[in-house]
Amino acid sequence: MSNYSKIKDIILKLNSEELLKEKLYIVGGTVPYLISNTMSNREHSDIDIIVAANDMNAVREYLKDNNLYVKDFDSIMFDYNKAKIDYGIDCIIDGITVNFAPYEIVDNTMIQKNFLIKKSSGVNALVTVTIENVKIEDCTTTVIVGQTKIKTYNLEMVRVMKEKSHKQKDAVDIEVIDKYGYDEKKYNDLKIKTNNMKFK
């Protein structure tokens, strides 16, 4: 059974909050459905969001103000994060995990940080992904859902990322993108750039 309506409501609420407006980019499997304005028939386990590194303080402030902040979900507080570098934060809203991951653009390179927790992923890890020659405007778009303005990865970037996975849910999401349509030139350009994506 799909939980998409609940997921969509959470995304709309977060993007309506004064402290978070214009700061969030939705990047996960919900994007094809938000952009195409179609109902997802699959279960969505979480909401993936990237945030400019210098806006992460606003995210933490919002979570604390709304009793959503949990120290154990904040990467800065992890005992294995010795350098106390920000790799993002999770929170739980209406039973759904929402992940806020910081990104920055340095010398025309997109650097995204995130983390894995042993409880859910089987391993504790701090992850850095770099994509060269990509600006935020190359891989994002804006969509109006109802009355709410939402920033997301564009469909081309979502398709590229989904292709790197071989999960059934990603194949389903790619079908939605293909049915709606996307810019092949932009897609091919992003595909080339992400081929050199580095993980550490």
Region annotations inferred by a language model:
Residues 1-200:
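Compositionally biased terminal segments of proteins
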